[in-house]
Amino acid sequence: VARLSLNQATIKRATVAEAVEGCVRHGIESIGLWREPVADHGLERTAKLVADAGLRVSSLCRGGFLTAVDNRAALDDNRRAIEEAAALRTDTLVMVVGGVAGDKDLVGARQRVADAIAELSVEAKSAGVTLALEPMHPVFCADRGVLSTLAQALDIAEKHESVGVVVDALHVWWDPDLDAQIVRAGERIASYQVCDWLTPVPADVLLGRGYPGDGDIDLGRLTRHVAATGYAGDVEVEIFNADIWAADFDEVIAEVSRRYHAIVEPAL
């Protein structure tokens, strides 16, 4: 499990301490953290806890939400997120860029994202942090992510040394141009996240993620394409699913490890 990372959202009800302890028990060497539970535990305490446990922090989630016409408060929050990522000794801040603002101006929202990333990239570079733009499935364009394809994320990322992209299986698997865009991304792939797309889709599509192997995504093929770029970073398992959230943390972590070994690791 050297490259397996447990994204904290997979065991959403767990505290930071419980998530770290679970990783250690199951021999998982890396964890993807979220800002809210980190704040609950305390930033410095979390950094020490993770370091003392010998874990890497594969990413911090999340910055972003930059699409408001007046996004000054969001920019300030993202500056704090960059500082938090540096304090946690991760070089990857996942950016969920935000949905369409109230004016329904999708073109304008995308431009505001590009402008904000240009501004934040300077501070990210100085902190040694990569802003990892996460393209999101088009179903989330209205409320979460106006960048729907890897190509759109790369159009912004390629302009800045400190900006990369996230390849999240759930968000990109459907894209007919995906293979070419993964090749294009190359060393700009800052994070690789896996889960599966469940059908039928639940009423809250956000919670439609399953364990690798339970859905419709060819994760072996996708993983081989990502690995072919030379990506050698951690592979996060990130699952939003009400039943998995309600389950015992230890059972979930054990199942994550089993699925990673069976489905993802052989393709790396």
Residue ranges and their predicted role:
Residues 1-27, 51-53, 83-84, 89-90, ...:
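Histidine-acidic metal/acid-base catalytic patches
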Residues 10-12, 35-37, 63-66, 97-101, ...:
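Active-site-proximal loop/turn and secondary-structure-junction residues that shape catalytic pockets
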Residues 126-160:
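Basic- and aromatic-lined ligand-binding clefts that recognize polyanionic substrates
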Residues 23, 58-61, 141, 195:
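Generic recognition of cysteine residues
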Residues 29, 33-115, 121, 125-126, ...:
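Structural motif corresponding to the early beta-alpha repeats
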